From Swiss-Prot:
Source organism of this protein record: Methanocaldococcus jannaschii (strain ATCC 43067 / DSM 2661 / JAL-1 / JCM 10045 / NBRC 100440)
UniProt cross-references to PANTHER family, sorted A to Z: UDP-GLUCOSE 6-DEHYDROGENASE TUAD
Disulfide bonds: none
Name of the protein: Uncharacterized protein MJ1054
Active-site residue list: C261
Coiled-coil residue windows: none
Family: Belongs to the UDP-glucose/GDP-mannose dehydrogenase family.
Alphabetically ordered keywords of this record: Autocatalytic cleavage, NAD, Oxidoreductase, Protein splicing
Length: 895
């Protein structure tokens, strides 16, 4: 039997390889010529355990790939496995499916019998529409939805829990018999076959995934009732699971659904058209427009950009796992997230919970995409802002030579003033701005009629300007002050040590070439260069996105698309500022260090270095009693040190002899290099409880580069939203399905309402909140459930006394509420105390919000201190029987 598989994405490639393993002659068809060529070389674009081995086993034997549809003429069965991506509302995009059907119509003979199998995930009614398109052809259409789980998809293909087959007419045995022959392997293994109609088969796929979410939401909802009637949700879940009609899976209250996910502060790298941006998962989710976002990924040979398919978030109350690797790199993810592991020379997938110390991950390096010359059209960028109203252009030649062309567009009361002084309102020239190109750098922009500081209307990011950006990121800042009548003025400053003459002169020469005026200030051993220009400040802050101070500095997106020589010049300015050369081992060895307090700057620099083949280590620390995290990036290994060391200019001469005197070529420490990636080992695995949102993404190749440049698998998708949309498209309100999301979002509100219902009115009530940070033994308040609950209590008029065992957590809470007085007034309705027993004194209720072992405290003493013996245990941490014997009323979560 000859089989064709149209579409060689995730589903299609596994289907083609699997059928080839069954012994069929299989042709995979895809419109991507480069992918087809790679597949015919045995190169697998997806990372699934066992997939590449099977591909190499069968390719160019009984498995081939092509961009042509001609092979389907000789195929008995044609599988449609093209993508049907969902939009933000859950609608399936069926354009690729129907396009493939049209290609089939153009290729096959109307009289030749074919079985066309739709494996793509499609809405109900799609198979019927396809048959209608093929009504003049001798074909049967079969619905055969896939149930592959990313990370173990090859295993799932060969070991399905059931095979779903939907047909137009169950009395027509021909297509049924053919499909049973195709899947004889499963028949022989006694895998259940469900033979049904089209619509039933289509709905089974969505219903299965959505039901898992519904099951979880059900148990979470039941936990609320359990609280109300004083039952124990843990015992209920266990007992329910013993019933074979129900089963014990997905019955853990409070966990929620949504698959694998990232901590909100983890980062990834996106491209929205200008170049790579370092962005947190939370920030990506909050972007209003994600339609054209691409994600930095890895295609097996090199770094590449892949389209973002989906970004989502969910509430999570369970363990997060931090995987720590060599070189100070790490990632924090949920325990069920798929991790890309290098094993026996192949990339495989493991769930986070299965990862062990010593497992290997990879850091891809090398350039991606097309490098190009980059020019900033400053006038065009300003035209999109209110600042354009205050911008002028000075060009005497333009005003004189082109006056008759310009005159109709002038808003001046006396147009000939323009011809006389050569100064034009920028907004007047916009309709004919192309005329400026004739005069190039003579077009000067400014925002004050004095023309004290002007800049070119376009700036090319050449070697000089790339160095200037680097100097700015290391030594620069943007300040704002106010002149007469409240006029805002902005200045760019760069500050060097007076001994850094080479770097000072370099900056001055660059500015002189651009015709940009500056002033110099020398004081107390420092040499500052100051540029008063609101426009240039806008370029650095808003066009290049460089940031304005050390805390928010970042590498411009444009730099990642620049030519390699430009990248090196940028690094030259960067390392000359905040970089340093360090002698080691009694002056026998060297390494290079770069320090920053900007998290995004650190992550972006690591990626930029990886693009250039440099692999660095990173250390997070607090320097000199600072409360701000610093990132120290270190470069070692002789060849790497020499490459970066030469960027320092004359300073390198003081260290060059040490590098030249190395007795052997010392390789970099902490990793091994392959042709296109570095290999790191898992050194430590840390588990910690987390309550808060986690974020998911899906990319078109299921891979992405995340924090510290690590390659990782994307998240597992869910079908709840798609099913909701199909309900709505059929004018049915999906009450239960919609509720699955709502239940999982409402847990903290429900817990608050539980407290409120006990008292009736919280106004004037005093509560001890035990635990302030988001988890035990930390001072981190981000995503803290305690803080969110405190806000709710304060808004209801309650008085809150907070306590945490960690001193810094207490300090951070005090500082946070002193800065933001919108909800709490520290010292009036909010107090943070250093002693637990002082905290509980005279309170109306105790609320536990963090998983500390409060059982070790003296609850008899606590009972004598409180006004009312009532405990709201948000973590189910206390010994219930012990507490009740002491006279406390106890309220847990589902207990």
């Amino acid at each position: 039997m000859n089989i064709s598989v149209i579409g060689t994405g995730y589903v299609g490639l596994i289907q083609a390889v699997g059928l080839a393993e069954f012994g069929f002659d299989v042709v995979g068809i895809d419109i991507d010529e480069s992918k087809v060529k790679a597949l015919n070389r045995g190169e697998c674009p997806l990372y699934e355990e066992g997939l590449e081995g099977l591909l190499k086993k069968h390719v160019n034997k009984n498995l081939t790939f092509t961009t042509s549809y001609k092979p389907i003429k000789d195929s008995d069965v044609i599988f449609l496995c093209v993508g049907t991506p969902q939009d933000k509302d859950g609608n399936a995009d069926l354009r690729f499916l129907f396009s493939a059907v049209e290609k089939i119509k153009e290729t096959i003979d109307k009289e030749d019998y074919k079985v066309i199998v739709i494996k793509s995930t499609v809405p109900v009614g799609t198979n019927r529409r396809v048959k209608e398109l093929l009504k003049d052809y001798n074909v049967d259409v079969v619905s055969n939805p896939e149930f592959l789980r990313e990370g173990i998809a090859v295993y799932d293909f060969f070991n399905p829990e059931r095979v779903i087959l939907g047909f137009e007419n169950l009395n027509n045995k021909k297509p049924i018999e053919i499909m049973e022959e195709v899947y004889k392997y499963f028949k022989d293994k006694n895998i259940p076959f469900v033979i049904t109609n089209w619509e039933t088969a289509e709905l089974i796929k969505y219903a299965s995934n959505a039901f898992l979410a519904t099951k979880i939401s059900f148990i979470n909802e039941l936990a609320k009732l359990s609280d109300k009637v004083k039952a124990d949700i843990k015992t209920i879940s266990y007992a329910m699971g013993l019933d074979p009609r129900i089963g014990n899976k997905f019955l853990n209250a409070g966990i929620g659904y949504g698959g694998s996910c990232f901590h909100p502060d983890e980062v990834l790298f996106i491209d929205r058209g200008r170049g790579l941006e370092c962005i947190t998962f939370k920030e990506l989710f909050e972007l209003e427009d994600k339609d054209n976002v691409k994600i930095l990924s890895f295609d097996g040979e090199k770094l590449s950009l892949k389209k973002l398919k989906l970004a989502s978030k969910r509430y999570y109350n369970d363990d997060l796992i931090t995987l720590r690797f060599n070189l100070g790199r790490e990632i924090k993810i949920t325990k069920d997230h798929p991790v890309v592991i290098l094993e026996d020379g192949e990339l495989k997938i493991k769930l986070t919970s299965d990862v062990k110390e010593g497992d290997k991950v990879i850091l891809p390096y090398g350039n991606f995409g097309e490098e190009r010359e980059i020019e900033i059209d400053i006038l065009e960028e300003l035209s999109k802002t209110d600042l354009i109203e205050k911008v002028w252009i000075h060009n005497k030649d333009l005003a004189t030579n082109e006056f008759n062309i310009i005159k109709p567009y002038l808003s001046n009361k006396y147009p000939h003033d323009v011809k006389r002084n050569g100064t034009i309102r920028a907004k007047d020239i916009l309709p004919i701005k192309e005329i400026l190109d004739k005069y190039g750098s003579k077009n000067r922009l400014f925002t004050a009629k004095s023309k004290s500081t002007t800049i070119p209307y376009k700036i090319k990011i050449d070697k000089d300007f790339a160095r200037l950006i680097g100097y700015y990121l290391s030594e620069g800042w943007i300040s704002k002050d106010y002149g007469r009548n409240g006029v805002v003025r902005k200045r760019i400053g760069l500050c060097f040590g007076i001994h850094e003459e080479e770097y000072i002169n370099d900056v001055k020469n660059i500015l002189n070439k651009l015709g940009i005026k500056y002033i110099e200030k020398i004081k107390d051993g420092s040499h500052s260069i100051l540029i008063s220009s609101k426009i240039l400040a806008y370029v650095f802050e808003n066009i290049l996105n460089c940031g304005i101070n050390c805390y928010n500095k970042n590498i411009p997106p444009q730099m990642f698309n620049a030519k390699e020589e430009i990248k090196w010049e940028f690094l030259k300015g960067l390392f000359r500022g905040d970089g340093g050369i360090v002698r080691l081992n009694n002056n026998k060895n060297l390494n290079i260090e770069f320090a920053t307090v900007s998290k995004k700057m650190a992550h972006s620099l690591l990626i930029l270095l990886q693009l250039l083949g440099i692999v660095a280590s990173v250390k997070k620390c607090y320097n000199n009693k600072s409360t701000t995290m610093a990132y120290i990036i270190r470069i070692n290994g002789l060849e790497q040190v020499k490459k970066i060391g030469e960027l320092f200019g004359k300073k390198w001469e003081n260290y060059k002899d040490i590098a030249e005197s190395y007795k052997r070529n010392i390789e970099p420490l902490g990793y091994k290099k392959s042709d296109n990636f570095a290999i790191l080992e898992v050194k430590e695995i840390i588990k910690e409880h987390y309550s808060g949102y986690v974020y998911s993404v899906e990319t078109e190749n299921s891979l992405l580069i995340t924090s510290y440049g690590i390659l990782i698998h994307n998240c597992f998708p869910k079908d709840v939203k798609a099913l909701i949309k199909q309900f709505e498209n059929n004018n049915i309100e999906p009450i239960l399905i919609k509720a699955t999301d709502i239940v999982n979002e409402e847990q903290i509100k429900w817990f608050f309402e539980k407290i409120k219902n006990y008292y009736g009115n919280l106004n004037g009530k005093t509560f001890a909140v035990l635990g302030l940070a988001f988890k035990p033994n930390t001072d981190d308040l981000r995503e803290s459930r305690a803080i969110k609950l405190i806000d709710m209590l304060l808004e209801s008029g309650a008085i809150v006394k907070g306590f945490d065992y960690v001193e810094k957590a207490r300090e951070n809470t005090i500082n946070m509420y002193k800065l933001d007085k919108s909800k709490g007034f520290y010292g009036y309705n909010l107090y943070v105390l250093d002693d637990l027993y002082e905290t509980v004194k005279n309170v109306d209720g105790i609320i536990i919000t963090v998983e500390y072992d409060f059982n070790k405290e003296d609850w008899e003493k606590i009972g004598n201190l409180v006004k009312e013996k009532v405990v709201f245990d948000g973590r189910n941490i206390l010994d219930v029987e012990k507490i009740k014997k002491l006279g406390f009323k106890y309220y847990g979560v589902g207990r």
